[in-house]
């Protein structure tokens, strides 16, 4: 079924920054998609086009990207008369029209907005739910509900505290369903609020960009201690494990790492990658840490590789791999990590996101689908994670509507699947393993 109209506009994301929203019309109706945006971005990500006009939104406007859709991409697609069910053809056409390696002509935010809307329209055209359409595009007969990784303590570039490491997450792997995982996550979150309030006072329970708490602590193991206490208090020590996103590229300084990077610079406190690796090993030993994302800088390949060989937990590449096929292939070859963080806006199209996921999975990696810190009410990634059967998703704390939008959609999907619903649980790293 052909597209009848494509219209883009500038809307605001959860941080009050502009982003792109696309409305695509077919005979079946109107399909709307909005594009997310990250705070700690990898240098190898596809280009997010911003206007740079300091008199509007401090330079962060996206009118250029919107205009590229309304004046160029949209009309070209309508003229081409491609069907919305041909996701790959549509994406390929836009990528070739852009003609750059990193989508810098039109902006990944322009191409992705259209790509997401086309995917939603394609599902409607086939008369199937979005998650089923995505599963078909990926060649998956199965559907899997993911374990949610709730980011409940925020540090790094997401928070105004001194904590260097960006995210401390809880994963309710012992739950029997996604709905139960939500309940467990929410209960631990509320207990954590009480623990933080009791220890640091009420103002320490203010939340960061992703709904997690941002108490003013400096020591990273103090955050882990808070999680451990909250998990015990909620009564789930056997059901909840811990994940971290260190986002180490944010505090990499001249070949070393600064765990107090928000204070005035002092090179004498910088530590080597090897020393940082030892710190992670102590975390794994003393706490139920099962997953660490971006433990080292995006170009510190050597440290990634030596660290991976010495641990048996999940090591996730985000800034390292940026959902990019070339970077993933490089990481596979160097044995740098064993899990891909999948962010649709890092690569900028649905087709390439599916390809990245399949490349990672075919090499025995896990895949974790992820939001960005600047989000919208769009729930596309909830359907994406089910269709791609990755078994794990991180989309913030059980707090803030732009985060809950995704989690609530996952509960609806589980409900719709009824007794066919499969929850990844403890098999979150490889949910397809029989």
Swiss-Prot record:
Annotated pathway: Carbohydrate degradation; glycolysis; pyruvate from D-glyceraldehyde 3-phosphate: step 4/5
InterPro entries registered for this protein in UniProt: Enolase, Enolase-like_C_sf, Enolase-like_N, Enolase_C, Enolase_CS, Enolase_N
Modified residues (Phosphoserine): 83, 157, 176, 263
Modified residues (N-acetylalanine): 2
Details of cofactor binding: Mg(2+) is required for catalysis and for stabilizing the dimer.
Positions contributing to Mg(2+) binding: 245, 293, 318
UniProt: substrate binding residues: 158, 167, 293, 318, 370-373, 394
Location of Phosphotyrosine modifications: 236
Protein name, UniProt field: Beta-enolase
């Amino acid at each position: 079924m052909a597209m009848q109209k494509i219209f883009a506009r500038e809307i605001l994301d959860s941080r009050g920054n502009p982003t792109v929203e696309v409305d695509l019309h077919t005979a079946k109706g109107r399909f709307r998609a909005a594009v997310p945006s990250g705070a700690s971005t990898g240098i190898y990500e596809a280009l997010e086009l911003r206007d740079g006009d300091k008199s509007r939104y401090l330079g962060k406007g996206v009118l250029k990207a919107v205009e590229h859709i309304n004046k160029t991409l949209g009309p070209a697609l309508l003229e081409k008369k491609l069907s919305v069910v041909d996701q790959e053809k549509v994406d390929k056409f836009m990528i070739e029209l852009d003609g750059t390696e990193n989508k810098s002509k039109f902006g990944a935010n322009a191409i992705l907005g259209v790509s997401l809307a086309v995917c939603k329209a394609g599902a409607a055209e086939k008369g199937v739910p979005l998650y089923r359409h995505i599963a078909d595009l990926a060649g998956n007969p199965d559907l899997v509900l993911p374990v949610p990784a709730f980011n409940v303590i925020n540090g790094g570039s997401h928070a105004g505290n001194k904590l260097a490491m960006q995210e401390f997450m809880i994963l309710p792997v012992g739950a029997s369903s996604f709905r139960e995982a939500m309940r467990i996550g929410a209960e631990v979150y509320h207990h954590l609020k009480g623990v933080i309030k009791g220890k640091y006072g009420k103002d320490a329970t203010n939340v960061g960009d992703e709904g997690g708490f941002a108490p003013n602590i400096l020591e990273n193991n103090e955050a882990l201690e808070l999680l451990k206490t909250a998990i015990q208090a909620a009564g789930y020590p056997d059901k909840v494990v811990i994940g971290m996103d260190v986002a180490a590229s944010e505090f990499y300084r001249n070949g070393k790492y600064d765990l107090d990077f928000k204070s005035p610079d002092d090179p004498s406190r910088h530590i080597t990658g090897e020393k940082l690796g030892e710190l992670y090993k102590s975390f794994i030993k003393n706490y139920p840490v099962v997953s660490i994302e971006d433990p080292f800088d995006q170009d510190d390949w050597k440290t990634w590789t030596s660290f991976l060989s010495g641990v048996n937990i999940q090591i996730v590449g985000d800034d390292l791999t940026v959902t990019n096929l070339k970077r993933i292939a490089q990481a596979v070859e160097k044995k740098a990590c064993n899990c891909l963080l999948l962010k649709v806006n890092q690569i900028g199209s649905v087709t390439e996101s599916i390809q990245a996921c399949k490349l990672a999975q075919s090499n025995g990696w896990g895949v974790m689908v992820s939001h960005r810190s600047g989000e919208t009410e769009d729930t596309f990634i909830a359907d994406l994670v089910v269709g791609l059967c990755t078994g794990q998703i991180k989309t913030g704390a059980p707090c803030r509507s732009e985060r809950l939008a995704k989690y609530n959609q996952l509960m609806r999907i589980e409900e719709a699947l009824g007794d066919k619903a499969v929850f990844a649980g403890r098999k979150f790293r490889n949910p397809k393993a029989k």
